Amino acid sequence: MAERFSTFHDFALAQLDDIYTEEEIDETLKFSIIELNSGVFINDGKGSFKFKKLSSLAQLAPGYGIIAQDFDGDNITDLLLAQNFHWPQVETGRMSGSMSLLLKGNGDASFDTVWPHESGIIVPDDAKSACMTDFNGDSLPDIVISSNDGPVRGFSMTNDKNIKNCVISL
């Protein structure tokens, strides 16, 4: 590329056929997208996987940070999605219809949506990653969600039924 473009500005303004020759384009691998839904792959135990689409609410925005964890203590894996995409290419527009989402596992490879106001996990930002930790030392898993050009948010789990939600923004 350095031989074809002397500045980043020239490269940014170039069309595809300015960047690559027809021969280079013909030799490239071409991919197609056949599934745009967010979902999970379920292992059938026989060496194959089946794709299962997540709920409609999970489709409102792409999920970037995903945690598979038993959040409610029922020994069934739940999912947490850190969602939104505020800065796609201009032609596509923002994909920011979510607050991030908790999906409660049912044990049969299906998940029920837990609304953000019920879970207490509300992240209206351009969320990009999620991880589990125990930042308060109580042996319960806590959640940390970071956002592109935004705050890092911590969500503290509790066994106290009198405490509805606890959020720590850093």
Residue ranges and their predicted role:
Residues 1-170:
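Beta-propeller-forming repeat regions
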